Amino acid sequence: MDYKDTLLMPKTDFPMRGGLPNKEPKIQEEWDAKNIYQKVLDKNEGNPSFILHDGPPYANGNLHMGHALNKILKDIITRYKSMLGYYAPYVPGWDTHGLPIEQALTKKGVKRKELSIAEFRKKCEAFALEQIDNQKKDFKRLGVKGDFNNPYITLKPEYEAAQIRLFGEMADKGLIYKGKKPVYWSPSSESSLAEAEIEYQDKRSPSIYVAFDVIDGKGIVDDDAQFIIWTTTPWTLPSNVAITVHPDLTYGQYNVNGKKYIIGKDLASDVAEALDWDEDTLELEKEFKGKDLEYIKAQHPFFDRESLVINGLHVTTDAGTGCVHTAPGHGEDDYIVGQKYNLPVISPVDDKGVFTDEAGQFEGMFYDKANKEITDLLKEDGSLLKLEFITHSYPHDWRTKKPVIFRATPQWFASIDKVREDILSAIDDTQFKVDWGKTRIYNMIRDRGEWVISRQRVWGVPLPVFYAENGDIIMTSETVNHVADLFEANGSNIWFEREAKDLLPEGFTHPGSPNGEFTKETDIMDVWFDSGSSHRGVLEARPELSYPADLYLEGSDQYRGWFNSSITTSVATRGQSPYKMLLSHGFVMDGEGKKMSKSLGNVIVPDQIVKQKGADIARLWVSSVDYLADVRISDEILKQSSDVYRKIRNTLRFMLGNVSDYNPATDAIAEKDLLEVDKYLLNRLREFTANTLDHYDNYDYLDIYQEVQNFINVELSNFYLDYGKDILYIEERDSHKRRSMQTVLYQIVVDMTKLLAPILVHTAEEVWSHIPHVEEESVHLTNMPERVEIDQAFVDRWNTFMKLRDDVNRALEVARNEKVIGKSLEAKVVIGSNENFDATTFLQQFKDLQQLFITSQAEVVDKVDDGVAYQHGDIRIEHAHGEKCERCWNYSEELGSVGELDNLCPRCQAVVKTLV
């Protein structure tokens, strides 16, 4: 018989290497074959629900790391809630309308102009559904569970119908109206944009100071004076109809080298500096309040029309002259103040950003190119006082990345003003993980303008509006609901396939159409209205879901997007927020915190991680970052995730190997009969479990990541598993000591696998399949471990012992360096009290100290001769006495033989005798 044949070495089929890229798809196939997602729902049916509502990603393009971060976070949450017993269905969704799909088809060579609108829309739909299929596969490959066979899709007839009905309810409440207002207009997209579709980038613009001649000073200012305005958009000067001054600011008429100028008094020195005036020549002739200047008339610098001086509270002294160039057709503040004075709304720019004949000699010019022509003209007639160029933050189209303009066009609006206070109140009733999240959406709602909901495109949900022969708008609950019914039965393409009269209820008449003729609106709805209707089209529509949702979780850009549009439509129609809690995550940057881009060569995509390392590595990475802020990823960071994964896997494998011959039904030791060290680890497991559950409850996954590593490294690897080898391998199979440890090890591996399951979904399943005697067919069908109160006094005593043990390890390391010993089993520890700590009395409470120290011998004395003082006693390390046992490698002075096996310590002799 060989010595090793007498040892109880670990046995498990659980492989050391993960092989995740090949293994994970097989595990997912098993989930599908066993219908695990549905079984989880069935298990929890009738329990309280937890509804995380999926914000729909856009159905175009491959997944990026932002998609992965978002979907993995959601999956961690719903899996955890399911394992707590909540009924937590997850219905994924897709946003399918909008310009990017139109552009994608154009890039693919689809000739838009050669197709009818209905034909082009059918191609858009087919493209979107193809994109969904691709993204769906990739999301599932990340281990995301959900009802992927029945997702919600914004182009589906039942969804579009729900959206139309919601629109109708808002219209019934007077919240939908048509108006000609300046809105963000994208010449590159040829469409209006909502605030959520705007991003700011630096742009170089001309900065000019222009003089307007006074033509009627009303006896207040001299008729030969000039108002000075400052603007960075010279192209809007053809639309100028007024100069706005603040009623409460003080203005001055200044004489500068014989010329008279009117500017804000507080800005005089700034203007002087900007225009290179010597302040000594700046002579104040008169001063007056802005309200005194109201209705003074000035001359437009190059058109034969007046520019009226008016009052406006939006004028500031932050920059400029205090006299603001006002063009109601090209600015929101200008428009609002212009309404008070019945000023004309001039906007001589077409859909492409080209001047119309209303712009006179500038007709046919692109607005940005006209800047030079206009400044040249101002220079010629002497109105231009200064021209320079500045770089400033300027709104751009988030899709085309090109500058946008403010342009007055007839648009459909959803009123924010009428529901603003109600939305702010709903935000107050909403939970946020971080205060800044609440502040962000609160301020956005507080400060946002009216919501332009119309778009001049074709791929979207039509606005269900008709026009009578006399131009009257027809938008009644009867007509809107009839359109909704048509959409539900046929899809929204019917709008483009039928005449207006065939889309109205049968027998419909209107006094404005004596001949029975009608036309229909050609604009479509903003895509944010599409996705912002999901609480109606999904949460209220699907029986397994409920309204309001417990949680919305998206990227931080959605405070101005989906979070915003959803709460607006929900409060407008239901009087409450569609979400009880709001949570957001940051963007994914490279390892240095830079934005990922192909040009920098720093792009990492989910597909690459899945194929090279496995989805569980991506999921572990998600748990390792502070997702509330922007997060970083790189090959080096992923390598760190892989290293941590390997440690977790190997620890679980070691424990599996050492419980292979354990059956909890027959071998478990009652808690009261456990060895103290095992009872200590059981309590530490309970602490670890409670902390981990708390972190899950608080959505703190980085804390879980750190908690797991700490438990594995400090409690298991550095102590319990190392200590345990002498028990598990050496002791008799059914000995109380071995079964005591196995009882706790089994509990650790079961509970730890459950706690890791929401994050390491595939690995936890693989581990579960290798744990002996578990009943459930999947770890995802189990419940999270219960919180169990710990014996704090007992744990405190053992924590003190562990600190003492750290001192022993320090002493062993010194002895190792001094060549007194090699391995710790070559050591004898002698320990006693000192002025710091009464080790002698304390250690009387502990048995088998040599095993706990992983040494061959340990002796507790009153006073240690030649000892070294440590925090928890004086310690001396000497070489162990006797000879090494060939079986357990402990040193003993009582070696003997059993059969053919020599040099066995008394313990090993007793064990081997049972085997011979």
Swiss-Prot record:
Annotated motif 'KMSKS' region, positions: 595-599
Enzyme class, UniProt record, top EC level: ligase
Binding site for L-isoleucyl-5'-AMP: E554
Keywords of this entry: Aminoacyl-tRNA synthetase, ATP-binding, Cytoplasm, Ligase, Metal-binding, Nucleotide-binding, Protein biosynthesis, Zinc
A matching Pfam family: tRNA-synt_1
Annotated catalysed reactions: tRNA(Ile) + L-isoleucine + ATP = L-isoleucyl-tRNA(Ile) + AMP + diphosphate
Coiled-coil region list: none
Record motif 'HIGH' region, residues: 57-67
Subunit structure: Monomer.
Protein purpose: Catalyzes the attachment of isoleucine to tRNA(Ile). As IleRS can inadvertently accommodate and process structurally similar amino acids such as valine, to avoid such errors it has two additional distinct tRNA(Ile)-dependent editing activities. One activity is designated as 'pretransfer' editing and involves the hydrolysis of activated Val-AMP. The other activity is designated 'posttransfer' editing and involves deacylation of mischarged Val-tRNA(Ile).
Protein's UniProt name: Isoleucine--tRNA ligase
